[in-house]
Amino acid sequence: MLPPAIHFYLLPLACILMKSCLAFKNDATEILYSHVVKPVPAHPSSNSTLNQARNGGRHFSNTGLDRNTRVQVGCRELRSTKYISDGQCTSISPLKELVCAGECLPLSVLPNWIGGGYGTKYWSRRSSQEWRCVNDKTRTQRIQLQCQDGSTRTYKITVVTACKCKRYTRQHNESSHNFESMSPAKPVQHHRERKRASKSSKHSMS
């Protein structure tokens, strides 16, 4: 048996030895993991990969296509300033109104239509439906005409205040065109039938 004094001196020595052993194990563990863990190679990540990870891949591109399909169409409004005349009477002040004879184009194309070719290429890919600019809103306006003899006249006229785009199908246009082209021929045929009927009645009477 060792005396108590020796135990008192051996206890700190044992603690020092245990700390050195733990430090040796920690150093070995750190060196071991430094060999196992490999540095991640710096690969340049493309924008398409990031978009697929964050936005669901192809779903993002489909939403872009859906936005392009919902194209709002606008009408180019032409403003007109003119005088109204009736014989020797002319309006005192000029009349300003809208003329709905412009072109119907997508709203995103309208600002860049003059001098830009994007609108022409885009609108050439339209479907079998055509858009026309027609009158949307009108109002009645009174105007005064000044005559050469000093008298004045008051007229009521209809003024266009807004235009809109109306969709027509090509089949509708072709059918109306065929109807208009065939309509003048009908009275001629009817006129010939009348001549033949009159001739036959004359022969029967003779």
UniProtKB/Swiss-Prot annotation:
Residues 176-206 are annotated as: Disordered. Residues 1-23 form the signal peptide. One of its GO terms (cellular component) is extracellular space. It holds the Pfam family Sclerostin. Glycans are attached at N47, N173. PROSITE patterns: CTCK_2 (PS01225). Interacts with BMP2, BMP4, BMP6 and BMP7 with high affinity. One of its GO terms (biological process) is canonical Wnt signaling pathway. This is Sclerostin domain-containing protein 1. The gene is SOSTDC1. Residues 188-206 have a biased composition (Basic residues). It comes from the Eukaryota. It is found in: Secreted. Residues 75-170 form the CTCK domain. GO terms for molecular function: BMP binding; BMP receptor activity. Disulfide bonds join C75-C133, C89-C147, C100-C163, C104-C165. InterPro entries: Cys_knot_C, Cystine-knot_cytokine, Sclerostin/SOSTDC1. Keywords: Disulfide bond, Glycoprotein, Secreted, Signal, Wnt signaling pathway. Directly antagonizes activity of BMP2, BMP4, BMP6 and BMP7 in a dose-dependent manner. Enhances Wnt signaling and inhibits TGF-beta signaling. May be involved in the onset of endometrial receptivity for implantation/sensitization for the decidual cell reaction. Belongs to the sclerostin family.
